[in-house]
Amino acid sequence: MRAINNKKKLLEICKNNDIVFLAIFGSFVKGDFTEDSDIDLLARFSKPKSLLDLVRIERVLSEVLGRKTDLLTEASISPYLRERIKNEMEVVYERAG
């Protein structure tokens, strides 16, 4: 996995948006990332989020990471892909407790 720049800012985003778990998966983790690739992220929240909240958080993450992100929640993952994603993902942030 490539190093994620600005981890301090990323942790701040997680804390300010009720993210208790954030993982990266897909081409970024597998090493076949290109200039056109987005960053696939899986998030778990401590409080329910509206679609507008998710879009706003995705936009903020894209700005910090310097490229388009695709933010998914566990509930939004296809059951057919869930196991593969969980096997390849790398945890970026997990709130203790």
Regions found by a protein language model. Name each.
Residues 42-44:
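Short hydrophobic/aromatic beta-strand micro-patches
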Residues 26, 40:
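Conserved G/P- and acidic residue-centered "switch" motifs that form tight phosphate/ATP-binding loops
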Residues 1-23, 29-35, 46-97:
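Catalytic core of pol beta-like nucleotidyltransferases
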